[in-house]
Amino acid sequence: MTAATVPAGTPAAPPAPAGRPGRDRYLDLLRTVALLRVVIYHIFGWAWLTIVFPSMGVMFALAGSLMARSLGRPALGVIRGRIRRLLPPMWVFALVVVPMMFALSWQPVKEEGAWWFIKLAWYVFPVGAPPFPWSSGDQAGLLEDTWAVQAAGPLWYIRAYLWFVLASPLLLRAFRKLPWATLLAPLGLTAVIGTGLVTIPGETGNALSDFAVFGSCWILGFAHHDGLFKDVPRYLTVSVASIVMGFGLWWASGHLTADGWDLNDIPLAQAAWSLGFCVILLQYAPSWQELPGRLARFDRLVTLANNRAVTIYLWHNLLILATIPLLDLLWKIPYVDAHLGSAVEAGYTLLMTLLIWPLIALMIVAVGWVEDVAAKRRPRLWPDGRR
């Protein structure tokens, strides 16, 4: 398995059944594709997927658009509602993962003193990065010793999302006064702190870098909601977006890491490529009250993914790891061990891909209803829009 700790997926506004007025199924479809891409990326680790579909930028842009729409109401109530929907699913995740970490010999770091215990509170309110052990258990155990790193990997997004939610009233006010400057400011900030020009150490630096890298995408969501690009000729928008994307690829070509063209490791390239990509997606965005044509067959899947986006996002990395001991049971079947062992080994990641979806489905049934409770809705086990 090729492991990666950069997540993807996004907390979304409380989804509604298909066809409800005001629900844009095009945006719902984009969110579903983004979640699918994130899961596949974390199984195979294909760097090129970050170029083909920059899921994180897309998710932040969609969330920014929804946030701008919500801020037509009093800001304090909107922020409270967003936090209320976000935190309970994370608390359930933490109630499972944190005891597992301690059970596998996780110990406080003496050098950090009381600060180590204070950081545990970030599993409750993740304004900072929740701590986790870099090695937990042993390599010969049921889960590989990096399982905690993989399980906690998606939590950076929760932190970034929370920062954006808290900052949105000020960001939206700035955007409506100086739209273009506000839209491009995070890209400029990334050029400073995401390239080594200025280094901010520790988790503070990581948090600021994430905020800068995806800030333009979040604010682009404001632009989409407010119709900033409606009066701009489409050819001009696409041309400028393509130049920005080209710059991102050019920058990446000179700053490749051990993972090659994985834009998750190249902040400025990620910021530029994601912004340009999202501009084009939203510039050509239709407004669908229902999925058209052949896409209609995926309506239930899209509805389910949007209703359980937080659950899928939080748990998918841990569930990917869970496929490994389950698949290893195949070697306990004598016929498989004797005749199919090499075939199973050659197709291991494909088998992981097939197995992850039933596991995600089980997790949706087991804990997904917490998203409904958090949104003050009636709990549902399988909210795919079927009546």
Q: Where do the protein language model's features map onto the residues?
A:
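Alpha-helical transmembrane segments and their immediate juxtamembrane cytosolic regions
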Residues: 2-387
